[in-house]
Amino acid sequence: EISACLVGSEMCIRDRFLTEVKKMQKKIALINDVTGFGRCSIAVMAPIVSAMKIQAVTVPTAILSAHTQFPTFYFDDYTDKMEDYIQTYKELNLEFDAISTGFLGSERQVEIVTDFIKYFKNDRNFVIVDPVMGDYGRLYQTYNKAMCNRMKELVKYADIITPNLTELTTLLDLPYPDHTVTIEELKKMCIALAAQGPKHIVVTGIRFNKTQIANFIYNKDEDFQMVMADRIGGDRSGTGDVIASVIAGMYMNGHSFYESVKKAAAYVSKCISYCEENKVPEYWGLCFEMYLKDLVDEC
């Protein structure tokens, strides 16, 4: 009898916990690696969405002491642990207001993430995919033909996608342009990608001219828009993660997709300017911590 009471009490506590969890502030699942030094992936995404009053729930794909641009780093592939890790969230009946995916290192990881989205996706949340595949016309070493095909399957579940030009052309099986891409070309490519599933697309980091970078925005069945930013310094690790997390946070807090991209571009530009002025090495990433208050003010 005493045992039965204890079991009943535990079930009651569990039920209360689940009820309270569902009442809490918005939650986003961040599926990405955890890197100790270098300001990238979950290490930048979690504090950014937290500053925007959103609870970050992490799903690690790998653990690194520093990102791969450093001459030495510790790496622990988390693929074989991901399903057991995710099972806890299923047993707790967690619900997410958004799901964000970043760099995925293998076909198996893409399969696991696709299954995660299928399980947790509903008509009240959205999925944002940053298809980290390559840049400047070259794919990363892990992205062979089979891996690219897996990523194309994942894109079908995205509501928002944030490719650069290399990733956009790869997802559409098009050659990387050997000229400055035109607005008409971008329109055609975005329409073609939207036909695969995404409602909102922003093609990031387009080298528009010698002094500006363009972010080309497409909302399905609506007009195209552009957000311009000054070209400052070189490429910095984690920039795409910062952009994706600011867009996700803004969009979760009720801002339009255009306003979300505009804020992300302005925030990144401000962080880059600080880094350049203070001679922060590019592989140390963005000093995003300096301007988190700018994001708090948007909530």
Task: List the predicted regions and their residue ranges.
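Single conserved hydrophobic/aromatic residue that forms the stacking wall/gate
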Residues: 1-15
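Conserved N-terminal subdomain of the carbohydrate kinase-like
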Residues: 20-129, 133-141, 293
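Short pre-catalytic strand/loop immediately N-terminal to key active-site residues, enriched for Gly-Thr
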Residues: 36, 224-238
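Conserved phosphate/ATP/ADP-binding segment of small-molecule kinases
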Residues: 142-224
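Short, small-residue alpha-helix embedded
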Residues: 170, 234-257, 261
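Short, charged, surface-exposed loops that flank catalytic or proteolytic processing sites
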Residues: 176-185, 252-262
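Charged C-terminal helix
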Residues: 258-299
